[in-house]
Structures are given as C-alpha cells and as structure tokens.
Amino acid sequence: MTELENAVIERLKSVIDPETKTDVVRMRLVENLWADALGKVRYTFRPSSFVCPIAVMLAVNIKKAVAEVPGVKSQEIAIEGYLMADQLEKLINEEN
C-alpha cells in the first residue's frame, strides 16, 4: 500500500456513520482503494444497505475527507450495492 493510500485510510477513519457510530473503514464501506503518484485516487463506496437512507450524506462526507488528504488531486468514486447507485455515482463524480 502506498503512502497516499495509507493517508487516505487514516483520514477515512474520521468519517463516522451516525447510525452505527462506527467509522467507514471499520464498516468496510470503502473498498478497492487505489492511488497513483500523481494524486489520483479511486475507490468503491458500498453503503451498508441497498436502500441506505444516509448513502448520499456518507458519500459526500467520504469525498470531502479524501479531498483533505495532502497529495490528493482527484477522485474517481464507484458506487455499488445501492438502489440508486448510477445516479449517486454520477452526482458524486461531477466535480472531479
């Protein structure tokens, strides 16, 4: 794992699911993390349920947290296991 990937994981530990009071890393809501030397980060966000009522909020919080990591220049986020995955993926990746 690269230094940037480790930094992203550490930052994601501060993103807490308000329903479970557990961070998104421990809940395994973020998977397939990859980062290159130019600061491009890719990962998959998998909400805890297919109809998770806070999926949008969590996705936004995750994206903001990753953006705060020094060295991160861009993000590509895949959404899986969610009823409106296509719509959320399009929305969350608009600003990249």
What residues fall within each predicted segment?
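Domain-level signature for proteins that mediate thiol-based redox and metal-cofactor handling
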Residues: 1-96
